[in-house]
Every structure is written in structure tokens, then in C-alpha cells.
Amino acid sequence: STQGVSSAASDVYKRQLVHLYSIDYMSSDPHNQRFFCYLSLFTFFMVLLVAGDNYFVLFVGWEFIAVCSYLLINFWFTVIEANKSAMQSFIVNRVGDMALSISFLGIVCLFGNVDFSTVFSLAPMMNESALTIIGLLLLFGGMGKSAQIGLNTWLPTAMAGPTPVSSLIHSATLVSAGVYVLLRSSPLLEYSSTALIAITWIGSITAFFAASTGLLQNDLKRVIAYSTCSQMGYLFLACGLSQYNTALFHLVNHAFFKALLFLSAGAVLHATFDQQDQRRLGGFLPLLPFSYTSILVGSLSLMAVPFMTGFYSKDLILELACSQYVFHGSIAYWLGSISAGLTAFYSFRLVAMTFLTYPNSPKKIYESAHDAAIFA
């Protein structure tokens, strides 16, 4: 399928870059062999999830990426914060997984098959109420993985793992799995207007909630984490408006600029002895020019500045929402537009507080700060 090929291509390509980045980032860690083992396992099951041609294979990949994310977030297992974050991520995702399991059982009972081609070809002949229930359960399952409102508590705390893990979880793998399920099940969702309206509302509210929460964050990685939550809201919004191709387009774009933001943030943390509080940074532009450029480019794309990749997909989602002459389409447009403004504000705030303001860190940090070795 188009969704599977696009997701797998962006996922594998981005993981290659993350692996290269991790070679230097994790070079001083005595357990880096275990780290790369987990990373490769995560890649395998994510590709399995998007490459399967039936719901059973999808479910196997879905469950195992949750296990791999637990292992990666809890990589530094002697740190209490990492233990708590990994457990929270695993437990919150179980809530959504339960709904997804029930939806798959419903598909088996209703269609007697789990192959995508068979299920989708029989969908027009099935009861609309049954398809609505399955659609709502698929939505609830996707909400857990994609950190939609109500099940989003695990995403900001998933920062406890190494920065390459944050990049994987927040850009094109774990959080995109929920959106992928909706994209892959789009022929079923089209027979349930109730499910589509619910998806639109959930996505719109999440985009606004996460963007407004991001305004109040001072942790460098948490700001980017809440931007992920907000962008997932845009993807759900697009799916609810039946604009699946646009959602897939933004999913691929988001994968790259969000990975760029996280990996660049990791380079900043590497240079500042893991200082994540933006209020204690500042003045690093002359010392970290490549990191600054990378974060600036990623932020401009996140803000949907014209001629950046994020502009072509994010602006298109808002344009399509505006063209929907229904109440939930108007709500989606206005909440999405306000969220875009808030996103621009906290993205510029991140760049300014980290690189452009007056130096607020100890002198020894500025004396030793330098760009990551990959830039040398």
C-alpha cells in the first residue's frame, strides 16, 4: 500500500541517520551494544508493522514496538526517573492497546477474516453501527500510541531515555503508529461518519491543547515533545476530514524535521553537560553554529514557514479544513490555525532562549562547548 511504502521508506531512512548519530553520541556509554540491539529490534518491528498485509501482522508489530520503546526509555535502568517514565509509557499504551485488541476481535467476528483486501471489499455490505463501533475502537487504540488528549501523559516523560530514543519515539515510529492504523483502516472509517467526526474533534483539541501547553515549558526536549503531540493532532484532524493523502504527506514531512530537532537538541545537551532548562542556556550561537542552524531549519519547518517542507503539508491541512462546509470542519480550522500561531511562538522562543539571549550558564560550559563531532 502507499501508506506502508511511504511509512517504511521514511522510517528506515531516518533510522539509518539515527544509527549514525548514535555512534558518537553513545560512544562513551559502556552498554552501547545493548543500545544498538534495542534500536535495531525497534526498526525491525516497525517495518513489520507497516509491511504486513493483514491486521494480525500489524498487531504483532504494534505490541512489540511498545516493548522496544519500554526497553529504550528505560535504557539507563539505574535511574529512577527512567524507570518511572518507561512504566508510565507502557501502562498508558496498554489502555489504547486494549481498545485496539477489541477492534481486531470485532473485525474477525464481523468479517471472518483479517486480510486487508478481504475486509475492505466486504465493508460496504456490513452494518453501519458495527463499523462505527470498530472505527471508534480503532480511534481509541490510535490515541494511546499517538498521544492524543487523555492518553498523552506518557509522551513528555518519555524524554528520560537517550536523545536518539526521543528522536525515534517522537518523529516517525511510535507516535506515528496510531496514525498509520487510521490510514490503513481508511476504507472502514469512510462508512462511519460518527467515527470520522470523533477523529476530527480529538485531533483538533489535541493540537490546541498540546500547543498551549508547549508555551509554558522550559525544558528543551519537553517543548519539542509537546510539538510532537500537537502535530499528531493535525494528522488525526486530516484523517477525520477524509484527507488521508495529506495526512500521509505531513506524516513523512514531520518525521524528518522532528528528527532534525531532536538530534540537534541532543547535540546542544552534549555540549552543555545535559543542561535542558532553557532559562539556564543562552548565548551559544557563536559556539554551536551548526546546531543552531539545524534547530532553526527544523523550527522553521515546524512553524510551516513558506518554502519549508512543513508549509506544504500543514498549510494544506488547514486549507482543506477551511473548505469543509460542516461545523466540525470549521472548528478544526480555527483550532488548527490558533495552534499554528502558538507553535510559531514557542518554536521561536526555544531558538531565542537557547542561542540568542544573554549567556546564563556557568563559564566552564562556554569554555568547553563545541559542535558534535559529526559536524567537525
Predicted segment positions?
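Single conserved hydrophobic/aromatic residue that forms the stacking wall/gate
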Residues: 1-9, 13
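Hydrophobic transmembrane alpha-helices and their helix-loop junctions in integral membrane proteins
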Residues: 15-61, 67-376
